[in-house]
Structure formats: C-alpha cells, structure tokens
Amino acid sequence: MSTGHFQEFEDEYMEMMYQFHEKSPSTRIRNRDLAEAMGVKPASATEMVQRLASKGFLDYKPYKGVRLTDTGLIYGKRMKRRHRLAEVFLSSIPFRGNIHRTACRLEHAINDDLEASLTVILGNPVLDPSGQVIPEADEKIRDLVDQYQTFHPLGELELGESAQIECIFLEEKVKSSLESAGLKIEAIIRRENS
C-alpha cells in the first residue's frame, strides 16, 4: 500500500470490504452501498475501488459490484483484526474517550510486532468489546506470538509459582500504590494462596 494519510483511506476501505465479506463472503458489494458505509459520495467510492482493484486487492466489475481478492482478503482481515485488538486494548486501560474512533486511528500505527505484543498482553482475545469476532492472526503473527508467549497474566499463576512483573496496566494513582507495596516492574512475586 502507499504511505501516509492516503494509506489510511485505503486501509479504511479494505477494512470495510472485509466487514462486508464477514456478513456475506460470496456477495459482490455495490459501490453505492460501499459509499454509504464509508460516508462518501458514490464517485469517490468508485475512484477508490478502481485504485484498489489496480493494486490487486479488489475484483471490480462495473455495474456488478466489487469483492475482495485473496490478497485483499488477507489485507482487509489484518486491518479488521488490528482495529478490534485496539478496541480490546482501549477497553482494558483507564480510557474515557470514544473507543471505536480511537481504535480507527490506532489501527494504522499497529505493525506486526505491536499486533503480536497486543495479542500476548491481552491474552489472545477472540471477541472485541461489542462481541464481534476478532479475525485469527496470520502465520507470521502467530510465530511472533509464540516468541513473546513468555508473558502471562498474574491471575494465571499457580499456588507456589513465582514470576517477574513485566508490565502493569493501571491508572497512575493505583500503580503508585502498588509500587509502594513492592509491586513494580521487574519485581519477583510468588503466589502464596488463592
């Protein structure tokens, strides 16, 4: 894909096409329906569809509609996965903003390493906060997740098991209280009772 602000528009179209694909995988989407879903004029949607088709992401047949190619399916799925992971992440931290809109902005900044890291620290979620299925990771991401899999939530510690704290997701005030009690990054802890 291209770089910069225009790439975000392409990403959004690919993500929306994947969303249509989730609902009806074999259906061609009319440009008018895509334009409506994207909140743009039909001419703008047609222009972007032609652009993405020329890059091999969409199969476009004038007056018949558009659908994802195999390459487009991979790309759209990746964008939707990153969006939904961002929503799960934003739901798990002290955040009062609009989760969906913020996730729309964050998804473009998530690369493979960050996607794998989010997968690990969020416990490989399968649903986003609204109950939508998070698409499965591709093989490259699964391999990275396997490399990073040394992180586990504290709640998974067995009785008598020790671990080192690697990250803490809490408001600064609560985090400070924990740190004053000795629970801080790199501290070794042991689960004594349930």
Describe each PLM feature range.
Residues 1-35:
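Extreme N-terminal segment that seeds HTH/winged-HTH DNA-binding domains in transcriptional regulators
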Residues 43:
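Key DNA-contact positions within bacterial/archaeal DNA-binding proteins
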Residues 49-50:
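Short, hydrophobic-biased segments on the C-terminal half of alpha helices
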Residues 53-62:
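A short, conserved structural fragment
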Residues 64-83:
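Basic, amphipathic "hinge/linker" alpha-helix immediately C-terminal to the N-terminal HTH DNA-binding motif
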Residues 107-170, 193-194:
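C-terminal regulatory/oligomerization modules of transcriptional regulators
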